[in-house]
Structure formats: C-alpha cells, structure tokens
C-alpha cells in the first residue's frame, strides 16, 4: 500500500500520514493518495513509501516537494508544453536525456500543465536515427517501445519508458502537474472510425482507445474515476483568486475527422461535444478568478491536416478547416463558445496549447475575422518537449488570428539536436494582476515575451 507522509518542514519531524491505494498488477503497480486539506500557499515536503500488505515491511523512501495553491493574491508562475518522445526521439544518453525537463524545473514553477501527447504510443523508439547534417541520434530502448502500442501493457510501457529519464523523475518529484491528453496517447490523429495502418494487428480503433485511456488514467497525476464512471479528463483547477485553469478534452467527444465543412452543428461536427461545451460555459460564467486559462490540446486557428477523404477532399484533424469564411464544421462550437464569453462579459481569457511542434503567439481579433461576435484574445503554443519539430502551420482566417511570433525549424521533423524544442511560462503579478507569457527554448532561454493587462471587470 502507498504511504505518503507530508510536512511543511523538510525535516518531516511532525509529518502527517496519508494512506493511498494498493499497488497491484491490476493497475500496473501505480497508486495514488488524495492529499486534500493541505495548508494554502505552503511549501510541502513529502516522503513516499510502500508498505508490504503481508509483512508490513516498508520500502526505501522517495522524497518530493511541492507548493500548495494560494488562498490570497500573490505571484503565480507555471509552465506548459506538450509532445514527449515523438517521431522516434527518445532518451538520448549522449546529450544527457530529456534536458528540457530540467530547464522547466529550474524556472521554479508552481505547477506544470502538460498539453497532451504525454506519450507517443504510435512511435517506436529505435536504437539510433540518422538526422539532419548526417548526425547520429541514439536512444535508450525498451521492449514496450519497440513497436506500436496495441496491448494494455504496451500502452503502459510507454509511460514507464518516460520515467527512465532522470530529468523527468526529478521534475516529477518537485513540480505538481496537470495533464490532458491528445491523439498520440492512442495513435496519430485518432478519431471515430479511423483506419489503422499495416503496423497494427488490432484493427478496431475503439479497442485501442479504451486501452489507451486506461493506461493514461493510471499514470496521469489526477484523482481516480469520477462520478461518470469513465474517468472524465476535462475539469477545472482552481488556483487561488488570480487563476482558474479549464482543462479541455478535445479527443474523446469529437466526430470523425472529415472535410469539416458541415453547415450545421451535430455529431459529425462535434469537437468538445455538447456536454463538455455546456460545462465549460457554466464554469467560465461562475469563475471568480481574475484570469481564466483555457488549456486546449489543439490550437484554434491553425490548419492541421489529416490527409484526404475518400472523395479527395482535405481532411482536418483540429478545429480549422482551411475555409476563411463563416464557421462551419467544428468551428461552430468555437463560435458558440466565443459568442457566449462575449455576451456573458467574461474577461481575461487566455488559451494555451501545444500539438503542432513549434512555438507561437497568436492574437485573435474580430476586425480580421469572418465571425466577429467575440472579444480579442491571445493563444500561445508550446512544444515539443522531446520530439521532432515541424511547422509553421497555415492560419485559418475565420476567427481572425494573426501571428505575433513563431519559431519553427527550417525543415520538417528536425531532431531535438537542432534546438527547436520549446515550453511556455506564465507569470501573474500578485499586485498588478498583469499576466506575462514567455516562450522559452530547451535551455530555458526566452524567445518571446508578452505581458497582458487584466480587464478591470474580469
């Protein structure tokens, strides 16, 4: 059984004990404990051990540290990114592993938001790759990462692989985390009815998605199965009076990827789905936090293609459909949401995302848009964390985005050796309420910085 002892002092002399769940093969020996009721705005030091169910013998301890959420106004800093171990780029011992996790840890964040693609279940890790300029990329390898994930244990093995990395383990021990998922937790661009390629012996995407979801929920640092019985991933994280984070699930409720030009809303044009969309509207309207960060696993206005359909029409993976006119397809849900935010006078919303494997800052304005019933807002893109770099993607003008900054590689699928790996940092000043977003590279060097003034009524 998991045993957690925590204290506000590093000595742990007056530690409080919380017993968690039992680690067993049924959940790949993952376990969790609910540390509710922590004192606010405190450094929390903890010790984790496992107690043998029969003998009572305790394992060697593992220590960690976190800062609890604030109760009063105060400075907040967090980091976000996505896309871990993609395109065959795994843990490279020649460069010391996934160093970007140490760069994020050294920013001393209050928490980390993983915007999805926490693993690449469809991306095996070979022993070596030849990359740009003839350079050699070496990987640590495991059996689970030798092929695409199909069995439950192979999906679990993708998460175990990432934990081999010393930078990831130290980061996990020091930084609280919020995870969401995207496509690669299952397979590339998955949606209902997806046709799997020849690497797969399991041909049913629904079977893969069910196994992938179980593995994600076992390894994600979040509370267990919720009232819906299916481990709902979308949720709100309240972080003091200055910040609410609205974590979306843009994967579980979508219709099949298509030309995305449906003239009316419906199951085929769903992206968030009606229940999640209603939840988001309700939670945004009820939020009293100054800043409302919408954590999306995909960008709004970037065109993300997914090949062609049976009729040779472009098929789309994200929200945008390449048509700069009025909202159609999945864009209709976003139009409904943006209209609601405007009419309800909900201020100070900022969108954070990843997915496209380069960093960018986008500013959406109705004066440039085909759909104009919304207030201007910012969207920031981070990633990748340890994967091939791509981009930049073309914009879709429906919601009037403009590129204020972007940094992408000179060629697609550039390796991490080239340096095009990015994370974002958000800082909220406790006195002024100003929110500042900084995009940083794998060494933590700032590439772009944007302060945003709060709206007084927000």
What are the functions of these language-model segments?
Residues 1-458:
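Metal-dependent phosphoester/phosphodiester hydrolase catalytic core
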